[in-house]
């Protein structure tokens, strides 16, 4: 039986999950998830968001409980570091820089790239590198390694297709979703008012641009996965301390990738800034008055 706790609507409201895009940008397929509009901005029905989030979290919990693998995907700037942080926190996998076509459907090619990455790392760490290669050659190998690491760090230990795909921003990650559909991999996804919920098995209506919203989603996803992992370990009799060892190693990799991204001087987006109320029914009348959401 699932241990997933009920979702707090106030928490969703405080994170700005209810802010959709401007009404001119909406996707009619999202109509049933929209509560109303204010100042030409759609307001998402958080009662549905809370209910559907619970369903999605239960899917994550059950997947990990049965020793399944989860692949978190979001390559947008404001979600990149967050999704890596929480995927690694729960010992799962992620793609947060660029989705390479065929990451799921052409795994052999991706596996070759991972093998190349590991070979470069081994060469650069060896004494042979100092003796057999010039500084220019070493620099060239380092650049190739860094480029591969940005794309593959989160899946380098993924030896088979994932059992569940978790996506933030279905528009940006449509290629990943299409590949998952071809392989019959179920998809959990945050769907904003400009999104297409088709091909999403577990849709979660919500703001997919706000950093605060994204962090809340990822925190909930990771907690559900950790609960599933804990249950799985109890059943199999595995020492739960091994989970921490796995997470520590993953976090080291995450810090390395984060430094690589900082060296590219990627711009950062700002948090959503708006007034929140204690009851969702008040959101339509007041929460949009200070409408500086990330969605436009």
From Swiss-Prot:
GO terms for biological process: translation. Keywords: Ribonucleoprotein, Ribosomal protein. One of its GO terms (molecular function) is structural constituent of ribosome. It holds the Pfam family Ribosomal_S2. PROSITE patterns: RIBOSOMAL_S2_1, RIBOSOMAL_S2_2. Residues 252-296 are annotated as: Disordered. The keyword Acyltransferase does not apply. GO terms for cellular component: cytosolic small ribosomal subunit. Belongs to the universal ribosomal protein uS2 family. This is Small ribosomal subunit protein uS2. It comes from Rickettsia prowazekii (strain Madrid E).
């Amino acid at each position: 039986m699932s241990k997933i706790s009920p979702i707090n609507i106030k928490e969703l409201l405080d994170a700005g999950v209810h802010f959709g895009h401007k009404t001119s940008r909406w996707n009619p397929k999202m109509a049933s998830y929209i509560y109303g509009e204010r100042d030409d901005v759609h307001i998402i029905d958080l009662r549905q968001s809370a209910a559907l989030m619970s369903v999605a979290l239960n899917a994550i919990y059950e997947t990990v409980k049965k020793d399944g693998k989860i692949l978190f995907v979001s390559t947008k700037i404001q979600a990149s570091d967050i999704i890596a942080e929480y995927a690694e926190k729960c010992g799962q996998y992620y793609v947060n820089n660029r989705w390479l076509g065929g990451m799921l459907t052409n795994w052999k090619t991706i596996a070759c790239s991972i093998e190349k990455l590991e070979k470069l790392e081994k060469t650069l760490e060896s004494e042979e590198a100092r003796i057999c290669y010039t500084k220019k050659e070493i620099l060239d190998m380092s650049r190739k390694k860094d480029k591969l690491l940005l794309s593959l760090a989160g899946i380098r230990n993924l030896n088979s297709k994932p059992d569940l795909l978790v996506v933030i921003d279905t528009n940006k990650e449509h290629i990943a979703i299409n590949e998952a559909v071809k392989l019959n991999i179920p998809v959990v996804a945050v769907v904003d008012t400009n999104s297409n919920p088709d091909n999403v098995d577990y849709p979660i209506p919500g703001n997919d641009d706000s950093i605060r919203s994204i962090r809340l989603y990822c925190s909930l996803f990771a907690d559900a996965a950790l609960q599933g992992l804990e249950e799985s370990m109890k059943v199999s009799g595995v020492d739960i301390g091994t989970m921490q060892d796995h997470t520590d190693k993953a976090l080291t990799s995450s810090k390395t990738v984060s430094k690589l991204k900082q060296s590219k001087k990627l711009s950062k987006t700002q948090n959503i800034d708006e007034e929140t109320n204690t009851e969702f029914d008040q959101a339509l009348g007041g929460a949009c008055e200070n409408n500086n959401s990330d969605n436009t």
